[in-house]
Structure formats: C-alpha cells, structure tokens
Amino acid sequence: MTKTDAQGRHPQETATHAATTDEEVQDQWRAPFEVLSRTLVFQHEDHRLWWERAASKLATYLRLAKYSVGSQYQHLLMFYSVYAPNLGPWPNDKRDNVHWVCGICPGGENLEISMNYQQGAKCTVRIAAETITPAAGTDKDPFNLTAEKKMIEDLKALQPNLNFTWFNHFQREVLVPEEVALNNDEIISKVPFKNQRLHGLDLSEGAFMLKSYFMPAIRSAITGVENTQIMFESIRKLNLKNANFISALSTLEDWMVPTNGRFMEYWDGISYDAVDACKARIKIYTGIRMKSIEHARDVWTLGGRLQGEDIEKGFDLVARLWRRLMDEEPSTCEMKYWMQWVWELRTDVPFPVPKLYFSVAAAEDHYVSDTVVEILDYLGWDDLVQTHRALMDEAWSLGQTTKSYLAFSYISVTFHSIKGPYITTYGNPSGPRPVF
C-alpha cells in the first residue's frame, strides 16, 4: 500500500506540489526587469535595445536603492512606454547613427542615470533624458519640439497632478517661441545646442517629480541680453516674498552678473524643484573652466560672500575630490577642467547653496569608482559604500572589466545646512562598451 503525506497526497503528488511551491517562491522574488522582459512587446529594434541595455541598468539602480517592488515595476514601465521607444537610434560603435547633439551628457548623449547618496536617507535615483524623432534638427523640427511635446503629454497622462505653473512662467521668460527662433536662423546656427529645454525625473516611491531645465542661450543670442540677466529677471518676476530666498538671490546676483557669471555660456540654465512658494527651490546652472583649487574655493564661496561652518564642510569634500579627480587623476583631457556649477536658492536658508559637478567622463571608471568609495568611507557611510560597489559591479560590470569609460559622466558634491552632505554619481548608459 502506497504511503501518503500528512495532507493525504501520494509521493509523486507531494514532489509535484513542492516543485510548484518552489517555482511560486522563485517567481515572487524574480527581479521586475526579468519578469517584464518576458512579457513586453517592442515597437522596433531600438526600443528593444534601449530596454535591454539602459532599462536593465535603471532596474539595478532602483533595486539597490531599495525602492519597493511596486515602485520598481512602476518606474520601469514608465521608462518602457515614455522613453525607450523615443530615444532615437541606439548608438553604434562609431556613434555615426546619432544625428542630434544633446546637452545632457558630455559627449552629446541623450540619457543619464544618477544615484544620490546622503546621510540617513534612502538613495534617490534620477534620470535625465531627451527623446528625439528622425526629424529632429531638420527643417521639419529644428529644435526637437515634436518628441518633447509627446514626452510631456505622456508623463502628464501617467501622473495628471504635475503642476506646470512655473513651467509656463520660465518658458515665457527664458525661452523664445519657435517662430521667433526660425526667423533668426543665421544667429541660431552659432549656438551649439538647439534645444531650449531639457527634462529630468526624480524617482520616488509611487511617483516621480518632473524637473525641467530652461536654457537662455538662444534668447540671449537673438535679443543680445546676457544669459544672467535673463535668468535673474525671470526669477524676480515670480514675486516670491520669502526673506531667505530674496537674500540668497541677491547674494548670487551680486557675484554673478558683474563677472558675467560664467565662461562657458552655453551651459547656463535654470530649473526648479517645487512650485509651492513656501518650499521653493530654484537652481541656477553655469559652466566654468577651472584653473586651480584656489579658483574653486573662490567660486564656492562667491568671492568670500559665503562663509560659515557649512560652507567649510562642503569645501572640505570639494578639496578631497579635487585631489583625487584633478591632481592625481592621470588623464590629460581638457574636459576635466570644464566644471558645472549650481547654486540652489531655498526658502529655508538665507544664502545660495553651492554644488560642484566634477567632469569625469574622460577618467577611467575603476579610478573614479575608487574615489567615490573613498569619499563615502570618509563620511562614514559604510552601507552606502556597499551599495555603490554593488552598483558598479551589477550595473556597469566593473568587476569583470579591466578598463571602461562613461559609467561616470559627473560626480557632484554639495552640503546642506539641514540635511548635510550629498554625493551624486551620474552615468551614461549609452556610452562606449567596456574594454575587456
């Protein structure tokens, strides 16, 4: 007589039930990217390539940043539907199939993924991307507006509560209408980046925040009004009454306008993080070719206007990164001296908060990764050291390569009086393939 188990099942039934249970458990914990890749249908080959090669990295970022499984699915499906089919050709080895130059990455690429590390908080994953169509840059769509409009509409459909009050304000005050730009074709031809806006997303649990960047270069070229004047006037026209915000704005304007504020004018831009006047955060971007650590200190402090413990703590991090990424980093590429600077104007502090982006696209990835480990270790963020190392191995395969480039485009550093230091790494998913 055949024995049965406690539930009255025969041995073969028991084995089948156990195998089924194991499969169910395995399916429950299978990575969202793997599950979706088995199911999704792609519109064309480039859609598939952007999914397999870029979304796979985004999936690793989300998982290692400890986003919930539900949020991982949500953000991956957003990338699949809004971005992956509309990012244009996946770049070939020579990159000669890419016809549109974007201002997001140092090499003109149109997708960037970043990981923000900060004290006592979950990591934040961000993406910046410019969707394109075959007509971008041609007479039919010289400023790549068709793809941008579709992207905004798609994001609004996914998250209808997106607030465009300040979006419309800065569009009106910083940019020029398409018809005006078209009537000044000869002037516009001298501006290297033809897009007047770029967009990024801060990914959070169950939602995203749209971050739009408005570049005044085309308006400046047409009107003859300096970029800095355009940007500061656009902010003042918001009529914000917060005393801290007004103080910070005046301090930055006092330093930036007389010196023309920058030496690489096409990197100028303005963005905002919130539309609530009580929580307003506006950022002003510029590019400066740096000469020395003393030059960096002068810019960090706005010529001595910014002082205090928080400024000094922030510059200590700048100096440590400068030593590794500038003084000791062996590349001789001019690019590493081209640094992006950002000042954040907030309602909770009375001075502009500086942020420096080190340009590291020409540096070898293992070297940059080791530098990030050193600064995270110096800050005592042991758990984030492990997160970063896992990210480099799993998303960028640094553990299996001898050399690779463009796992990093930038490393940024800032120090907030309330939340402390922030370290952010920026990577280009469509960069050169690793050298094994």
UniProtKB/Swiss-Prot annotation:
Residues 1-24 are annotated as: Disordered. Its EC number is 2.5.1.100, 3.4.11.17. InterPro entries: Aro_prenylTrfase (IPR033964), Aro_prenylTrfase_DMATS (IPR017795), DMATS-type_fun (IPR012148). CDD domains: PT-DMATS_CymD. Transmembrane segments: none annotated. Dimethylallyl diphosphate binds at residues 126, 211, 213, 283, 285, 357, 422, 426. It catalyses: fumigaclavine A + dimethylallyl diphosphate = fumigaclavine C + diphosphate; an N-terminal L-tryptophanyl-L-alpha-aminoacyl-[peptide] + H2O = an N-terminal L-alpha-aminoacyl-[peptide] + L-tryptophan. It comes from the Eukaryota. GO terms for molecular function: aminopeptidase activity; dimethylallyltranstransferase activity; peptidase activity; prenyltransferase activity; protein homodimerization activity; transferase activity, transferring alkyl or aryl (other than methyl) groups. Pfam families: Trp_DMAT. Induction: The expression of the ergot alkaloid synthesis cluster which leads to the synthesis of fumigaclavines is positively regulated by the brlA and stuA transcription factors. Residues 1-12 have a biased composition (Basic and acidic residues). Ergot alkaloids are known for their toxic effects on humans who consume contaminated grains or livestock that graze on grasses harboring ergot alkaloid-producing fungi. Due to their strong affinity for monoamine neurotransmitter receptors they may also have clinical uses such as treatment of migraines, Parkinson's disease and cerebrovascular insufficiency. One of its GO terms (biological process) is fumigaclavine C biosynthetic process. Keywords: Alkaloid metabolism, Aminopeptidase, Hydrolase, Prenyltransferase, Protease, Transferase. Pathway: Alkaloid biosynthesis; ergot alkaloid biosynthesis. NCBIfam families: arom_pren_DMATS. Homodimer. Fumigaclavine A dimethylallyltransferase; part of the gene cluster that mediates the biosynthesis of fumiclavanine C, a fungal ergot alkaloid. DmaW catalyzes the first step of ergot alkaloid biosynthesis by condensing dimethylallyl diphosphate (DMAP) and tryptophan to form 4-dimethylallyl-L-tryptophan. EasL also shows tryptophan aminopeptidase activity with preference for linear peptides containing a tryptophanyl moiety at the N-terminus. Belongs to the tryptophan dimethylallyltransferase family. This is Fumigaclavine A dimethylallyltransferase easL. The gene is easL.
